[in-house]
Curated annotation (Swiss-Prot):
Globin domain residues: 2-146
Family annotation (PANTHER family): HEMOGLOBIN FAMILY MEMBER, HEMOGLOBIN SUBUNIT BETA
Annotated tissue distribution: Red blood cells.
Name of the protein in question: Hemoglobin subunit beta
An example Gene Ontology biological process: hydrogen peroxide catabolic process
A GO CC term assigned to this protein in UniProt: blood microparticle
Keyword Acetylation: yes
Modification N-acetylvaline occurs at: V1
Lineage: Eukaryota, Metazoa, Chordata, Craniata, Vertebrata
Organism: Chrysocyon brachyurus (Maned wolf)
Family, similarity comment: Belongs to the globin family.
N6-acetyllysine modified-residue sites: K59, K82, K144
Amino acid sequence: VHLTAEEKSLVSGLWGKVNVDEVGGEALGRLLIVYPWTQRFFDSFGDLSTPDAVMSNAKVKAHGKKVLNSFSDGLKNLDNLKGTFAKLSELHCDKLHVDPENFKLLGNVLVCVLAHHFGKEFTPQVQAAYQKVVAGVANALAHKYH
């Protein structure tokens, strides 16, 4: 992903304020609610029958935190996203058989959640930078599929 120095600054500046536990769970929860077919990858998570059940599910929150911690690793390695996510790409492709389109969906949901949490601070410039990053991460996660 090619980001300008200003875009990198915008991304890292906002990311330093992100509560990974809260935002991760909310992003994954919203993915599972807005795109319910993604729930099939989370059969072991228990009750996902209603939006309230999804958003209060401890396993959704825990996995969302794990996802965002991996995303944080990506932010530290923007010049080598494919390398950073190589093992996760392999896992999601070969073992879990996740449709790579879901990575794009989750990235877009994450952008929505960040906008919700940061309001006016999430300017169009910040959004544009984050859209580049989530697209790059989704592409890196889909790399094993190519």
